[in-house]
Amino acid sequence: MDHYDSQQTNDYMQPEEDWDRDLLLDPAWEKQQRKTFTAWCNSHLRKAGTQIENIEEDFRDGLKLMLLLEVISGERLAKPERGKMRVHKISNVNKALDFIASKGVKLVSIGAEEIVDGNVKMTLGMIWTIILRFAIQDISVEETSAKEGLLLWCQRKTAPYKNVNIQNFHISWKDGLGFCALIHRHRPELIDYGKLRKDDPLTNLNTAFDVAEKYLDIPKMLDAEDIVGTARPDEKAIMTYVSSFYHAFSGAQKAETAANRICKVLAVNQENEQLMEDYEKLASDLLEWIRRTIPWLENRAPENTMHAMQQKLEDFRDYRRLHKPPKVQEKCQLEINFNTLQTKLRLSNRPAFMPSEGRMVSDINNAWGCLEQAEKGYEEWLLNEIRRLERLDHLAEKFRQKASIHEAWTDGKEAMLRQKDYETATLSEIKALLKKHEAFESDLAAHQDRVEQIAAIAQELNELDYYDSPSVNARCQKICDQWDNLGALTQKRREALERTEKLLETIDQLYLEYAKRAAPFNNWMEGAMEDLQDTFIVHTIEEIQGLTTAHEQFKATLPDADKERLAILGIHNEVSKIVQTYHVNMAGTNPYTTITPQEINGKWDHVRQLVPRRDQALTEEHARQQHNERLRKQFGAQANVIGPWIQTKMEEIGRISIEMHGTLEDQLNHLRQYEKSIVNYKPKIDQLEGDHQLIQEALIFDNKHTNYTMEHIRVGWEQLLTTIARTINEVENQILTRDAKGISQEQMNEFRASFNHFDRDHSGTLGPEEFKACLISLGYDIGNDPQGEAEFARIMSIVDPNRLGVVTFQAFIDFMSRETADTDTADQVMASFKILAGDKNYITVDELRRELPPDQAEYCIARMAPYTGPDAVPGALDYMSFSTALYGESDL
């Protein structure tokens, strides 16, 4: 059988799966684990003639880790990698981890990279996994798991010792007595246990650790001070150390195993005997309870009152809820115990159990069946009796409820039917009262069924000789008499409501006609007042003319509006005549509108007053718009001249910069004269600014007489000045380049001609392909092969350092001047510094100050980095990096 099958693997690895790795962040626990795990590893590595000092460092290359596994397993691992690279280390660690996994161990979140990186938490977790697999897994006491078996072994070995109570692998060991007890139990000559004191843990711990190391060959894996100074010592460190004691004393286990075997047999026999006694007692108690309960359930004596029957039902419910469930459980447990006992006896080769007479499981089941039958008959009888009494109580309660509901419904109904609220109501209120009365009639008809039900229930109670029948009959008669009276009052009120409705309908029609015509006329007047008082905002002559035309059209509608006003007032006067003639009691005003004749007359007068005010406002605005139009035309006339002039000058400058002839000095003089002529145009720009200021003050936002805005003119003017200044600057830079590089005028003209030839869009710049064609025309050998492409990329990085994708003429001139003239280089400067330094690779401060002018010497001293070569002397400076930095080949 495989000792490391899946079941055992799960058992001994259970602590690892439950291990909270974050606890390793506790410095005290980490310290204990470091020391314990290091000592445990060294106790095995010393067999191979080696050891470790730093647990997270010495296992990083995987060599000692593989050696440790070979020692503790007695097996050979794959040949390790001897290289020093990270990949070799990871390979070795993976071989070790694969070997551990092959033993049925689950490696939870442990990877080779973390071990190689020296991750303390992962390294300690890996060593703990190894300890579990190879030092603790095989520990088993009475079929317990590894951890529980080790704990049980400790408890049994220390049980006879006072002040020792091993419950765990942390605080139970803090006083040191547990370690001393383990040693004394197996080697009593090594420790005088009677002299140990519980209040002196340091002495106890040091005594146990020293004796174990000296006489038992168990290395010292813990520090007494660390255990005492920690509230909860690390469980894994304690388990590792205690497992060493277990293996050291494993020889003493044989006698204990034999004793355990005998105890186990006796325990099984005692347990079986106890189960037999429990069965007999439980069966006797259950049968006695059934015997007492059946007569109670067979009692069928009836009760006269509902309360008494309900009490019997409540007692029966208590029996079902409180008394019977525990007995059901006892019966079930009795059967379970019987079956369990028979199984245990059969498995342990004992004879089957035979209960005493009358206490067999079948006897109990028969008695229980009799109980169930009596219980069922008793429950049916209770329910029938309760139903019989409930019927009478239900009918009486039903009569009272229906009578109460009917009486509550009729309360106030007679007073409501006698009131004359319709005499002062409006037509809508009359119609509402009629609808309400119709609803009441429907409600009255619906309640007819309830009255009939009340009479029928009273009749049934009389037939069943209900004890309180007289009061029921009196109440029923009163309800019937009241019902007849409500019917007569209902008919009388309907007739009165219908008469009043007809009288008010005529007035209502006139009110409705008034409202239909008054509302739109009122809206028209309100709209007219809003329009006449509306603040208009216009920007053109056309807009103000449109407003004036609309106002004249409005004034033409006023006579017809006045006729409509008089017609509406005539309807109101007709209503007043009808009210006076027929003495109608009007409770309120027109229900269809809140508009009164007084409001109509008041708003009409207001409209007549607003018309001349609107006339005056439109006249004043018309004059203002005429003035604004003159300002627009004045600005447009000037802008239409200045705008094209600026555009023309911009185009001329573009042509001049491309088509310049003569010497650079002649071109520069020509450009400056051209710039002067442009600057002399400034007064016209200022005059246009003045006109623009007047337009802004007049709040004029558009101008159909020109497409040019002042902002457009300003931007164009600034661009014009900037362009001529930039062109002059380019010519000045060309002169500086020519003089500095010794370029002749013929070369400059040739460069300009070549550049202009390939600048086909006259933009003043060359694209990459245009620039490449230009270089080829000047004799550069730039092919389409990889070498040619690389050379062209190098040149582009010089002329277009910002990678804008274009080459300016100035960049072109700079490049051509560097290509055709002698230049100084970083190598030349380094060679010069080497001469000053006496052929050394560095230079000193004194040499710089002796050979160079003071200001230049201090400049070099402040910027040169210290020289760090093997031949450096104090104060040596690195002139090589300084020289390359001067030419942008490194950082200065």
UniProtKB/Swiss-Prot annotation:
It is found in: Cytoplasm, Cytoskeleton; Cytoplasm, Myofibril, Sarcomere, Z line; Cell membrane; Cell junction. F-actin cross-linking protein which is thought to anchor actin to a variety of intracellular structures. Association with IGSF8 regulates the immune synapse formation and is required for efficient T-cell activation. The modification N6-acetyllysine is found at residues 95, 195, 676. One of its GO terms (biological process) is regulation of neurotransmitter secretion. Pfam families: CH (PF00307), EF-hand_6 (PF13405), EFhand_Ca_insen (PF08726), Spectrin (PF00435). Residues 746-781, 787-822 form the EF-hand domain. This is Alpha-actinin-1. Residues 1-247 are annotated as: Actin-binding. The modification Phosphotyrosine is found at residue 12. GO terms for molecular function: actin filament binding; alpha-actinin binding; calcium ion binding; protein homodimerization activity; protein-membrane adaptor activity; tropomyosin binding; vinculin binding. It comes from the Eukaryota. The modification Phosphoserine is found at residues 6, 471, 677, 890.
